[in-house]
Amino acid sequence: MRVPLSWLQDLVQLNETVEILAEGLSMAGFEVEAIDDLASHAQGVVVGLVKDHQPHPNADKLSVCQVDVGSGEGLQIVCGAPNVRIGIHVPVAMVGATLPAVGIKIKASELRGVPSQGMICSLAELGLESNGNGIAILEEIAENVPDLGQPVGPLLGLDDTVLELAITANRPDGMSMVGIAREVAALTGASLQLPQLDMAPIHKSFEPDSTSSASMLKGGLYGLTALENVDGELTSPAWLKQRLERSGCKSVNGVVDITNLVMLEQGQPLHAFDIDALEMITGQTVSAESFGLRQARNNELFNGLDGHQLQLNENCQIVTCHDIPIALAGVMGSAESGVSAKTRRVWLESAMFTPTAVRTTCRAVGLRTDASSRFEKGLPVEMTLASARRAVTLMEEHLGIKSNGCWVYGESPKSAEPVKLRREAIHRLLGPIGVENDNRYLEDDIIETSLLALGCELSPYNEGWLVIVPPSRRRDLSREVDLIEEVSRLVGFDRFEANLPDPLEPGGLTTAQTAERLLRQMLCGAGLQEVTTLSLVGADSDEPQRIAISNPLLAETSHLRTNLWEEHLRICQRNLQSSQPGCWLYEIGNVYTVTDELINQRAVLGGVICAERSFERWSTSGKIKSMTYHQARGQLSQVFQGLKLDINDRPLKDNHSLHPGRSAELFVEGKLLGDFGQLHPALSERLDLPEATYLFALDLQCIIQAATRSNRWNPTFRPFPTVPAMELDLAVIVSKECSCSDLIQAIRKAGKPLLEHVELIDRFEGGQLDPYSCSQAFRLRYRSKDRTLSEDKVNPIHEKVRQALVKQFSAELRS
């Protein structure tokens, strides 16, 4: 945002130097990226009169001019401009002058054998917009030309200073001169002299078609003002052109210049359509009801005002007239409908478009404009009609244009709700300020002065104030903490004291934090790498329950995520496309769901085990050996064993992202922990991922609670065994529906008190087994506390285990 100080001075009284003003704005959040002193562009450039003009003896395209600069002695200057002639006043750069716009220092030189003592300048060489290729002729720029030898800077508007500000996304009010003026007034206490606006101009209603109606209501408001007695050939007054040029806008014609001026002044983009051009394009009479707002069709063509033809798609929102595209909504108008020298009637559009729609359109066509940069940040709907009325007033005053009515479709802006601002909350969050070696809390009058400077309305109550923020000024002040931040910003962050806890106490990790760190170590030890992904995702028609955020910067980051695995699979895709053999990763992060209209935030451990982990394949004779379900599940078992957790697996039936026959619900202490399983074949095919891709999503809080039980977490002494153990294998044929965890649980129960450990060592399907059965083999370790076991002591218990499996699971014994 370019802020000319001469324009700012007309809106607010400036008593500070440029440097102090720039520092104050930067400290308040409007970073000043550069200070452009326009006078430096014309330092050493004076008014000259061409007294003589002769062809160069040694060059066809050069001429030798005798120029009078009021010093008594004429200057001989070699010039290459085609429009130089006798009797014109021109800007002359004297020897020693520097032209920053082109990086030239003027020296006395000799061009093709002819001495030259200066340079006759074009507007471009002085850093100004120029429509021609020749030198600047001062008679064509101003009616009254200064005396010879006088500085040319004031005549060309090069007597100003421009601040270049970086405006953040949360401060759209900073994209207007009025917004910056209010900020300066709030910081310095200076008085404002703002243009008077009609905040509720008289208007009529119109009814668009149903599709346009929904889109216009989503934006908030769509207004059209009919203008007559327009002369498209009229140019803007010199002061208006200078303001636009200093602000970085090019002058086009009177109508367009005033719409741009109002955009820079008030922050509300406007657009003018030539009514006669619209009727020629559509072949029909154009009224307010003729306008529409819809999504573009794929491959629909659009000719922009910048001269480029764009191929649109369904992501682009367009303004139409009788369903023919005439503008990219909030971005740019069409070349066919723009104001030209032949324009006599105009529809002035003043509308609100949603930031998401404008941002999506810009990304779809690869184009950003001054208008779109404002719509993307979000604008107050209260200023839409007021800005249009401001533009009409300027056109009536300077161009003789007449208004023939205003038509509006949309809902009336709602009145602002008061925000409670508690005195205690201010003191608690900000702390005391240092005043003459004495720390004290902010006094009420300082707080009230800061809020009144923002234009707020205050109503005191026993705990503080009820604050109403005018929506036309600031849309980001909707909470108590927002107001507290504004108070601290205006008072000065550097004035608040640093308050440390007294006394300072040593820090430390809680048991839960220590357990989480141990969990991360175990996961890394199992070969998984930790990642961190963004918690914001795009909308998904398959997941309508995703929570939308109120003011997204991008359509791709407009909602809160409901799971971790979607982004994890994208990471796997990128790694495999980069020739990585596999991708094993995990993340501890939050997911967000809605229950009974309440937003729930839940910490989740999620991860992916995808394909191989290492490059070398010597152990498999160079062949790719896909990881099986049980091998992948075993990697997770290592982690749980490190936390001393016993996990039970049960068949999973209702997760459409996982393979229906190779997935399980995991339970710890009888509580559901989460899901583990192979990626569904349809998903793996669509995402071009290998079949051997396994996902897990587990409740972090459940893991931490189970791992930190005192019987697991607190270390206990257990002596090393002093007697040998006896190991026996047990193989049974059971139904495929029978889970390993159920079998192990039954074995442990039946094997007491001598059974020390049991583990699955083999699982087999196929061969001579029927298609509904499988063989599972377990290794059981028996040990007594005080003596060596003999077979006659172990066999009865082992037989008890065998019979328990036969009775509970109809198992067929194989060993």
Curated annotation (Swiss-Prot):
Domain tRNA-binding: residue ranges: 39-153
Pfam family, one: B3_4
InterPro entries found in the cross-reference section: aa-tRNA-synth_II/BPL/LPL, B3/B4_tRNA-bd, DNA-bd_dom_put_sf, Fdx_antiC-bd, Fdx_antiC-bd_sf, NA-bd_OB-fold, Phe-tRNA-ligase_IIc_bsu, Phe-tRNA-ligase_IIc_bsu_bact
Family assignment from sequence similarity: Belongs to the phenylalanyl-tRNA synthetase beta subunit family. Type 1 subfamily.
Oligomeric and partner information: Tetramer of two alpha and two beta subunits.
Cofactor info, note text: Binds 2 magnesium ions per tetramer.
Reactions it catalyzes: tRNA(Phe) + L-phenylalanine + ATP = L-phenylalanyl-tRNA(Phe) + AMP + diphosphate + H(+)
CDD domains named in the record: PheRS_beta_core (cd00769), tRNA_bind_bactPheRS (cd02796)
UniProt keyword terms in alphabetical order: Aminoacyl-tRNA synthetase, ATP-binding, Cytoplasm, Ligase, Magnesium, Metal-binding, Nucleotide-binding, Protein biosynthesis, RNA-binding, tRNA-binding
Protein name per its UniProtKB record: Phenylalanine--tRNA ligase beta subunit
Binding-site residues, Mg(2+): 476, 482, 485-486
Taxonomic placement: Bacteria, Bacillati, Cyanobacteriota, Cyanophyceae, Synechococcales
GO MF terms held by the record: ATP binding; magnesium ion binding; phenylalanine-tRNA ligase activity; tRNA binding
GO process annotations (BP): phenylalanyl-tRNA aminoacylation
Residue ranges of domain B5 in the record: 414-498
Entry EC no(s): 6.1.1.20
